[in-house]
């Protein structure tokens, strides 16, 4: 039986993932206002969740200004979905599912709109893309664990 809290936590996390980096990082407002295609706007908003490069941050090639918005947005998304789904295990599952589904939606919409995905996964961009995915997963897992711990254990009803 599927828990309605888990499904609701994942859905709310996915919905908030469209807007959280937009609110945490105001430089994307100009990019979004320039775009006329709604599909491009959605891709920019979802792709902003994966812009922070965790690998470059620890190798010393990134500054803290780019660090905070994307990681805070991932932690907030994970925290929100973990709190709604209630429980440590369910919070971890919900926050992981949110980031995985966001990544899949981002890739699918990028293919539909005709973006060049090969540029993201080759050469110098490969490290940035993998670092962005890892940072989003790490932030969501931290947020999901915090949300699951704070919300308390899940009550099993039989």
Predicted regions and their residues:
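Membrane-water interface at the C-terminal end of transmembrane alpha helices
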Residues: 134-155
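Individual transmembrane alpha-helices with interfacial aromatic-anchor signatures
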Residues: 124-138
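Short, charged juxtamembrane terminal tails flanking transmembrane helices
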Residues: 1-6, 149-158
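Membrane-interface interhelical connector segments
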Residues: 28-61
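Hydrophobic alpha-helical transmembrane segments
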Residues: 64-83, 87
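Hydrophobic alpha-helical transmembrane segments of integral membrane proteins
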Residues: 86-123
């Amino acid at each position: 039986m599927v828990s309605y809290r888990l499904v609701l936590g994942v859905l709310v996390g996915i919905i908030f993932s469209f807007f959280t980096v937009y609110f945490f990082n105001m430089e994307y407002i100009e990019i979004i206002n320039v775009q006329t295609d709604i599909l491009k706007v959605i891709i920019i908003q979802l792709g902003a969740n994966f812009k922070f490069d965790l690998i470059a941050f620890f190798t010393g090639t990134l500054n803290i200004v780019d660090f905070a918005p994307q990681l805070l947005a991932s932690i907030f998304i994970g925290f929100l979905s973990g709190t709604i789904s209630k429980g440590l295990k369910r919070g971890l599952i919900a926050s992981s599912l949110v980031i995985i589904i966001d990544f899949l939606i981002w890739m699918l919409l990028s293919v539909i709109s005709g973006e060049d995905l090969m540029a993201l996964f080759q050469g110098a961009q490969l490290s940035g893309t993998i670092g962005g995915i890892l940072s989003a997963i790490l932030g969501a897992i931290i947020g999901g664990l915090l949300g699951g711990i704070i919300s308390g254990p899940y009550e099993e009803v039989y």
